[in-house]
């Protein structure tokens, strides 16, 4: 796979420390790992949240163009709800950061590298934004 994009999106200074803290948190959780070299890195930008934190979004479009899609049939909500007829109890789960529970293969880790103004980081866990992430999850 020949991909060479390493464009760095500018990050507003007001959000830089918050972004660094979020990246450090994800490194501490084993989701990201700092790398010194990478032939490819997806540009990453941020979206400020209402609570003052930031969500960073990696632009995996170039990588997605080259990935062979492995679709998994995701059931429709209506069909799932119809199957609940007659049930007395139901549970609700918050799958916040759910993708991050799935470890990537060594080859996939090399492809899932992101670039920020302060360095490159390799995803160790399944990132959001890859075309196969919902199907794998």
Language-model regions, residue ranges each:
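Reverse-transcriptase-like RNA-dependent polymerase core
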Residues: 1-4, 47-55, 84, 93-124, ...
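Conserved hydrophobic/aromatic pocket- or pore-lining residues that grip, position, or stack substrates
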Residues: 26, 44, 59, 80, ...
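Active-site beta-loop-alpha junctions of metal-dependent nucleic acid enzymes
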Residues: 65, 72-76, 129-137
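Metal-dependent nuclease catalytic cores in nucleic-acid-processing enzymes
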Residues: 79-88
């Amino acid at each position: 796979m020949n991909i060479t994009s390493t464009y760095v999106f500018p990050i507003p200074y007001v959000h830089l420390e918050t972004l660094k803290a979020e990246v450090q948190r994800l490194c501490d959780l084993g989701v990201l790992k700092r790398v010194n070299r990478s032939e490819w890195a997806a540009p990453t930008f941020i979206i400020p949240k209402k609570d003052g934190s930031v969500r960073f979004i990696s632009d995996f479009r170039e990588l997605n163009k080259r990935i062979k899609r492995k679709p998994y049939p995701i059931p429709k909500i209506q069909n799932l709800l119809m199957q609940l007829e007659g049930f007395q109890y139901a549970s609700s789960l918050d799958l916040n950061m759910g993708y991050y529970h799935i470890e990537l293969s060594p080859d996939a880790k090399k492809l899932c590298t992101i670039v920020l103004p302060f360095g490159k980081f390799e995803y160790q866990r399944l990132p959001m934004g890859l075309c196969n992430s919902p199907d794998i999850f």
